[in-house]
């Protein structure tokens, strides 16, 4: 779920599948399908990001790229949502009946805005806005890539090849240890989720090296599909935030799901489905806007059931509806952000084009 790079390959398709699964997982809450998706959908993104990790880049160069591709988009989206806080309050998206924290319950005055500046923009806790609830991923991916790049710089200075492998192997027990004792660091936050992300990130990096030797076929895809469909019968509500005694099982389940997505992506690549490429290349926009888009369906449910507008404050969706509404949530959660991205780019191009024509128009008027 990195910033759009307009690539057409099986990883782009895997990202498309991942972002579709993410939207479905947020829409189909407390369901069997939700449990299947949460086995692997976030690890898939860390895996895909690690797949493209350039171990020849310098740490400074990677830092610049990460700031440009992760922090700056994060900053722009969170700044917009932050400044529009009181608008969302008037729209009942934030209200006292369904808000879970002070942020999502109250109208903000100057002192309230100032109180959250460091938390949201320095500590990158954009998820507190709720509307950008998925932005915890951006923070974790940023630190994951920087920590990996830092260890790679040490590896290059030592002229060794084992430092990243060592980081991979120690990240697994460290993720368990940090979750058990709730270990964190200033700015970075909880270290357990970061070490889990590093594990999947490095597995993606090494997967790319050995992928030419791996065979994707319909039989392996079907086998992994059966596995991920069977696991939720024995394990309810899995996610990257499972208790420490289940983390090992989660690693295994996530890798099965990742292999399934890569297999499907590899098989679909031959059909050159442009929609999947478009979705995969605009995954960041979908991440940012799908919770906003859900409010369209929630508003319709409120209207036909004569509910209070405060129900717009329920995140991510209004539960207890029939499956048709979950499907509707999924569709708008994917396509409204895509429409926004498409028309926004058309608008920007039109503005740039008009600006470029101003000198020409001035010259014509002078004649």
Task: Describe the residue ranges of each PLM region.
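Alpha-helical transmembrane segments and their immediate juxtamembrane cytosolic regions
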Residues: 1-367
